[in-house]
Amino acid sequence: MLLSYIAFVLISYGTLPLVEFLGDGDEQRGFALTYAFYGAITFAVFLLTFKGVRERYVEGDSASNPLESLAHIGRARPFWIMFATSILIFTLMLMPDSAAIYFFKYYLGEASSVSLFLAMGYASMVAGVIFNQLVMRRFCKRRVMIGANLAYGVALASFFVAADQGPPFYLAAFMAAKFINGIIAPTMWAMVGDIADYVEYQSGRRATGTTISAVTFSHKFGMSIGGLVTGVLFSIYGYTPNTEQSETVLVLIKSMMSVLPAVGALGVAALMLIYPLGDRRMAEIRTAKPTAA
């Protein structure tokens, strides 16, 4: 996960310059060639990964087919809480990443600065991922998610005010939010592993792959909803590309960088209050599940 966020830093800072270089003034061609370049690198890395991975399978009573696995997962209440959590995260909480270009282009009038802004945010997120290791050793994952999402909401809400106070203030608010997001992301993935263990404990059958796939689906579903929400809001409030925006649209853009994702963070914190798998409960489950060492 740490390396993936380092890649985010490089992509955030390098994409627009690469578009300009490859497109030679043609933005559409530049983006097409840039993402083709990224795709080629991704394909090569996947090949290297598959070549180097050796599966270590722990013998256990697995479900005989995916539908049976899905049936077991569907009866697990923690899964549905995590499913809703993931949708909130990928619909609202990651909205600042997609709204940043609009914020810099129309609200600040400094479109060229967005690459550095995002790169610094993701660099802060890398620091948060590293710090997460210290936090997870001392605190229950559920409590970390509650506290981190409350802090994330406060940091994002502060951006609404900081946006009008100058670069040091809005950059500090964004970097603080991204640092906290670096704590949230790996904690969420650790909880997905807990759900897989819970499903095995509850059903007596392993369904780890299907559990992870189902949660990953919620991520993609949330991303698609997030894109839809952004488009619908822009349409409702009268956004017109490449023109001077109305005051209403400018407030919407600033809210997409701050208030709306903050609401998502508070929603996640609320869901975590009813999430039943704390670290103490998971210790009991791992001792009792069929493949316990």
Task: List each language-model region with its residue ranges.
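Loop-to-transmembrane helix entry/capping segments in MFS-fold secondary transporters
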Residues: 1, 111-112, 199-218
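Glycine-rich segments within core transmembrane alpha-helices of 12-TM secondary carriers
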Residues: 1-17, 122, 214-234
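Helix-to-loop junctions at the C-terminal end of transmembrane segments
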Residues: 19, 127-141
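Loop-to-transmembrane helix entry
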Residues: 29-36, 100, 106-124, 169, ...
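Helix-loop junctions at membrane interfaces in 12-TM secondary transporters
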Residues: 160-174, 184, 190
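Intracellular juxtamembrane helix-capping segments at the cytosolic ends
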Residues: 184-203
